[in-house]
Amino acid sequence: MEEKAGLRHLQNQQNEPSQDPHQCADPCPALHSDRNHLNKEAEAMEGQNPTCSRHESAYPIQSQVSKSKKQRNYVDGAAVDDLKNLWDRLQTLQQSLTEMPYAEGLKPLKNFTSFEELLSMGGDSLLNDLLDIQDSITQCCIRASKYLNKEGNCTSLNYYKQPFIAAVYGPTGCGKSQLLRNLMSAQLIVPTPETVFFITPQVDMIPPQEIAAWETQICEGNFLAGPENTVVPQSGSIMPRFIQMSYAQLTKDENYDVTSPNNIFANAASKGPIAIVMDECMEDLGGNRGIAKFFHAFPSKLLDRFPKCTGYSVIVVLHNMNPRRDQGGNIANLKIQAKVHMISPKVHPSQLNRFINIYTKGQPTAISLLLKDIFNYHRLNTNFDWIVYNTEPIDNCMHWMYLSPQEGLIPMYLNIQGKLYQALERIHRTLTDRQRWTRYYHSKKK
């Protein structure tokens, strides 16, 4: 009958799917049913048994968590400009590293032949990393610009940080005395001192011409140009005082006690900021009598006791960066407490290299060699320029600075040079990996 009625079984027809053991015997309506069609079967929510028997779906109900995408999957116009700016800086740095005399033991870094080759062959991963480095450099420049004037020069050495302890290193004839006066007249030490104590081994060592130069330049540094051809004093004193003292007077016991009425420094600090300048005193500093308290203990007591004393500065001149005689430990303590080291390029290269090796341990070797090359260039081509190292700069761009009578105090941005060298290493690593995989591919083809 079935054959006659055309109800023949189809060949190769699959059997009915077996009942799911987890399925309820009686169908139950879905949690959200159609109110107009109550009997209409709807898909159940996750966790419910379906109302009809069907194969389990091969796809999960929950969508897979999408993977994080790259920051940039294409290079737009602004990114191309950033990369071009970075590329120009990289070319300048790589050329400087290649041409400097200290580059003999430096590892050469591979690079693209042109900016167009970098864009076409660099790849998304490399270009994104370079853009991140460029963004970091831009942020560093923005943060540093807050402390610079319109010409890009630093406006101060200490930016009101107290106490200000500085060491000046340089041989005879490199302009140390002129530098000390320029620090006062250019207002690179803030606040401006109202009293300057000039310490020498003997008082009669200073010629009258130098005394007149000191008095003139500290007076010049006490004023700024105001409106309508007026001048504005920068301290509470119209005429700052210049006091000469011998090293023996400095080391009197009464001058260590801030409560003593005969303490000459306390009397001056009760009226305003003070500065102590020690010149030609290296032999006395190497003696047995210690004066290290002038570098750490004495300033804190003086600043706490006299509110008008908003600034305490000590500047010590040394002819040798590593003197053999330091019986009292004064020079060693000075180097530890000094926040600023002002170095003449005329200092012996062996002493310079030792100082650079100690204070550039966080920088790549190439940047340390670049700094040595900068010192060497100014040693051969300039006379009265200085390189300044700040242990506690207000911004990382100002760890190393360059002081010129013509250009002023300029940051050297060695931290940015380190980031640029990091970008060169990133390019070198990419090209090296590609060459290694190319060699591996050709070796397998053989």
Swiss-Prot record:
<keyword id="KW-0231">Viral genome packaging</keyword>
<dbReference type="GO" id="GO:0044423">
    <property type="term" value="C:virion component"/>
</dbReference>
<keyword id="KW-0010">Activator</keyword>
<dbReference type="GO" id="GO:0039708">
    <property type="term" value="P:nuclear capsid assembly"/>
</dbReference>
<dbReference type="InterPro" id="IPR003389">
    <property type="entry name" value="Adeno_IVa2"/>
</dbReference>
<keyword id="KW-0946">Virion</keyword>
<dbReference type="GO" id="GO:0006355">
    <property type="term" value="P:regulation of DNA-templated transcription"/>
</dbReference>
<feature type="compositionally biased region" description="Basic and acidic residues">
    <location>
        <begin position="32"/>
        <end position="43"/>
    </location>
</feature>
<keyword id="KW-0547">Nucleotide-binding</keyword>
<feature type="region of interest" description="Disordered">
    <location>
        <begin position="1"/>
        <end position="72"/>
    </location>
</feature>
<feature type="binding site">
    <location>
        <begin position="170"/>
        <end position="177"/>
    </location>
    <ligand>
        <name>ATP</name>
    </ligand>
</feature>
<comment type="subunit">
    <text>Homodimer. Part of a genome packaging complex composed of packaging proteins 1, 2 and 3; this complex specifically binds to the packaging sequence on the left end of viral genomic DNA and performs packaging of the viral genome. Interacts with protein 33K.</text>
</comment>
<comment type="similarity">
    <text>Belongs to the adenoviridae packaging protein 1 family.</text>
</comment>
<keyword id="KW-0805">Transcription regulation</keyword>
<dbReference type="GO" id="GO:0098035">
    <property type="term" value="P:viral DNA genome packaging via site-specific sequence recognition"/>
</dbReference>
<dbReference type="GO" id="GO:0019083">
    <property type="term" value="P:viral transcription"/>
</dbReference>
<dbReference type="GO" id="GO:0003677">
    <property type="term" value="F:DNA binding"/>
</dbReference>
<keyword id="KW-1048">Host nucleus</keyword>
<protein>
    <recommendedName>
        <fullName>Packaging protein 1</fullName>
    </recommendedName>
</protein>
<keyword id="KW-0067">ATP-binding</keyword>
<dbReference type="Pfam" id="PF02456">
    <property type="entry name" value="Adeno_IVa2"/>
</dbReference>
<keyword id="KW-0804">Transcription</keyword>
<dbReference type="GO" id="GO:0006351">
    <property type="term" value="P:DNA-templated transcription"/>
</dbReference>
<keyword id="KW-1188">Viral release from host cell</keyword>
<feature type="compositionally biased region" description="Polar residues">
    <location>
        <begin position="10"/>
        <end position="21"/>
    </location>
</feature>
<dbReference type="GO" id="GO:0044095">
    <property type="term" value="C:host cell nucleoplasm"/>
</dbReference>
<dbReference type="GO" id="GO:0005524">
    <property type="term" value="F:ATP binding"/>
</dbReference>
<keyword id="KW-0238">DNA-binding</keyword>
<dbReference type="GO" id="GO:0044196">
    <property type="term" value="C:host cell nucleolus"/>
</dbReference>
<dbReference type="InterPro" id="IPR027417">
    <property type="entry name" value="P-loop_NTPase"/>
</dbReference>
<feature type="region of interest" description="DNA-binding">
    <location>
        <begin position="439"/>
        <end position="446"/>
    </location>
</feature>
<dbReference type="GO" id="GO:0019076">
    <property type="term" value="P:viral release from host cell"/>
</dbReference>
<comment type="function">
    <text>Component of the packaging machinery which encapsidates the viral DNA into preformed capsids and transcriptional activator of the viral major late promoter (MLP). Binds, along with packaging proteins 2 and 3, to the specific packaging sequence on the left end of viral genomic DNA and displays ATPase activity thereby providing the power stroke of the packaging machinery. The activity of packaging protein IVa2 is stimulated by protein 33K which acts as a terminase. May be the protein that pumps DNA into the capsid powered by ATP hydrolysis.</text>
</comment>
<keyword id="KW-0597">Phosphoprotein</keyword>
